[in-house]
Amino acid sequence: MITYEEYVKQLKELDVYSTVAFKRVVPYVLIQQQQNEDELLLRLRAPSEKLVGEINNGSNKLVIIDLKISYSHVYQEPQLSIQLWETNGRQENQEEEQVDEIYLWYPNNINETLAIPTNLFTIELDTVPRPRVERTTTDNINNSGSKKLMSSSAWYVVHSCDTSEIVGTPIQNYLQRWASVYIASWWGIVRTPNNC
């Protein structure tokens, strides 16, 4: 376990790309990184040779993977959430340059799709709250004053149970060790799914 305060401190220092395992599998391109006090979102694009492969009648491909690191107050552990985005490769306007549409993709078996060993940890589809932009009375949308509105979206969530047993209990570099296990250990092995 790690306290929220220690988690926030280590999150500021976390460099997922510095883990040894991640350095070996650099084929994924970081296209966006957002960080606030207690969350880190990495949006990665898979290069063409690492695409999961053809799915849904041979036309769709995985193109973007979002990894969100947050804190589970219930388990007092870091939590990894995953979203997959696919493209259908369809041209919207044949006369102009090709524009791919991208969609959230929820494969039947996330472990198989991302080649994550099922004995490593449990992954389940769940809704994850996300804060929306604060609105004030000047927005003419929310007349009740300044409120932080919440919405939620579906993510694959890696269950936080047994994290201390997997990562080890020393607090020093806890989050870096966690990232090595929960992200870098499986990240380099994306393959074609058999059952989507």
UniProtKB/Swiss-Prot annotation:
Chief localization: membrane
Q: How does it sit in the membrane?
A: Peripheral membrane protein
| Keywords, sorted A to Z | Autophagy, Membrane, Protein transport, Transferase, Transport, Ubl conjugation pathway
Q: Where in the cell is it found?
A: Preautophagosomal structure membrane
Q: Among its keywords, does the record have Membrane? A: yes
**Enzyme superclass (EC):** transferase
Q: Which GO terms describe its biological process?
A: autophagy; protein transport
Q: Give any Gene Ontology cellular component.
A: phagophore assembly site membrane
Per the Swiss-Prot or TrEMBL record, the active site comprises: 161
Q: Quote the EC number.
A: 2.3.2.-
Superkingdom to which the source organism belongs: Eukaryota
Pfam families according to UniProt? Autophagy_act_C
Q: Which GO terms describe its molecular function?
A: ubiquitin-like protein transferase activity
Q: How does it assemble?
A: Forms homooligomers.
Q: Which family does it belong to?
A: Belongs to the ATG10 family.
Q: What's this chain's function?
A: E2-like enzyme required for the cytoplasm to vacuole transport (Cvt), autophagy and nucleophagy. Acts as an E2-like enzyme that catalyzes the conjugation of ATG12 to ATG5. ATG12 conjugation to ATG5 is required for proper localization of ATG8 to the preautophagosomal structure (PAS). Likely serves as an ATG5-recognition molecule.
State the protein's name: Ubiquitin-like-conjugating enzyme ATG10
Lineage, opening ranks: Eukaryota, Fungi, Dikarya, Ascomycota, Saccharomycotina
Q: Which gene encodes it?
A: ATG10
